[in-house]
């Protein structure tokens, strides 16, 4: 089983050119599936029938996987089995036609503009703080994904034109603007970057000089949020969601926000219209003389 998995990982990395972060997610899901299969005396992919696929989902649910994670696991298995069919290892893809449990509607959490101001108002001149502030200013200014921020190089940034070149999902490149505050924060970081003895051209590096990891970015943002007195857990997704919501609140241009976020489908961006409506409804309830609800 593992030999075919390794061939698939090589295919994803070399031919599909998936990012390391995405590849790790595929590997994590498929390795978990293998554990479930082998614990139940299934030791080859030819033994995987539709009933076995349903059993894997049921077992995963017993282990505490939520709807969204179950859908991801099924998707990873379905794509892998399809690869085996194309390679002639299987005759049929047993995961085709099997649906994951229906996902409940998910509205991403975001910060309001006052909370963003609270987060980014910090005048520390410590090099690590300058780096962290630059990362967060850029992520909020351009709506970057965590993987896009982490993979930036020095030549990805054009300070003069205030543009950043990012490689998004599917290896698609897009050029994004960033604002004055992000520009100032990046320039302050670049003045002290050499103190970290960088080993490559990564824009953001760790204290050891290596490209900063996804996990380190997440931990630093969580720490920063606590230090700045924010309520709730701060993570990269929340900054990206806040960017999208604030852009819609101020422009209502769904297509433009789609392009900025790098969404291939407009339906993915449309989830933010629900957030926008919630904001408008709250304003209406507070402002309209006949809209105020009884306590």
Curated annotation (Swiss-Prot):
The answer to whether the entry has keyword Cytoplasm is: yes
Which of UniProt's keywords are assigned here? Cell cycle, Cell division, Chromosome partition, Cytoplasm, DNA integration, DNA recombination, DNA-binding
Q: Which GO terms describe its cellular component?
A: cytoplasm
Q: Report the locations given in the UniProt record.
A: Cytoplasm
Q: Which residue ranges does UniProt annotate as crossing the membrane?
A: none
The chain positions of domain Tyr recombinase read: 106-285
Question: Coiled-coil segments, which residues?
Answer: none
Please describe what this protein does: Site-specific tyrosine recombinase, which acts by catalyzing the cutting and rejoining of the recombining DNA molecules. The XerC-XerD complex is essential to convert dimers of the bacterial chromosome into monomers to permit their segregation at cell division. It also contributes to the segregational stability of plasmids.
HAMAP family according to UniProt: Recomb_XerC_XerD (MF_01808)
Q: What is this protein called?
A: Tyrosine recombinase XerC
Record organism: Histophilus somni (strain 2336) (Haemophilus somnus)
């Amino acid at each position: 089983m593992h030999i075919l998995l390794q061939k698939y990982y090589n295919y994803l990395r070399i031919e599909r050119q998936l990012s390391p972060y995405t590849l790790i997610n595929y590997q994590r899901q498929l390795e978990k599936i293998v554990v479930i299969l082998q614990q139940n005396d299934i030791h080859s992919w030819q033994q995987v029938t539709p009933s076995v696929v349903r059993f894997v989902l049921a077992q995963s649910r017993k282990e505490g996987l939520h709807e969204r994670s179950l859908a991801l696991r099924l998707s990873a298995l379905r794509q892998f089995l399809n690869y085996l069919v194309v390679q002639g290892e299987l005759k049929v893809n047993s995961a085709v036609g099997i649906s994951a449990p229906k996902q409940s509607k998910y509205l991403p959490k975001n910060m309001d503009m006052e909370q963003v101001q609270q987060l980014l108002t910090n005048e520390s001149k410590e090099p690590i703080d300058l780096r962290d502030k630059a990362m967060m200013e850029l992520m909020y200014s351009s709506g970057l994904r965590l993987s896009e921020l982490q993979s930036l190089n020095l030549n990805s940034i054009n300070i003069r034109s205030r543009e950043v070149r990012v490689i998004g999902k599917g290896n698609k490149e897009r050029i994004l603007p960033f604002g004055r505050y992000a520009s100032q924060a990046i320039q302050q970081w670049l003045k002290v970057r050499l103190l970290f003895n960088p080993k490559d051209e990564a824009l953001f590096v760790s204290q050891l000089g290596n490209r900063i990891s996804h996990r380190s970015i997440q931990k630093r943002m969580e720490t920063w949020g606590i230090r700045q007195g924010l309520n709730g857990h701060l993570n990269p997704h929340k900054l990206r969601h806040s960017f999208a919501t604030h852009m819609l609140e101020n422009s209502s241009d769904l297509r433009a926000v789609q392009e900025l976020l790098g969404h291939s489908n407009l339906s993915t961006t449309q989830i933010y219209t629900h957030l926008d409506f919630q904001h408008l409804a709250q304003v209406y309830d507070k402002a309209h003389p006949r809209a105020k609800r009884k306590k």
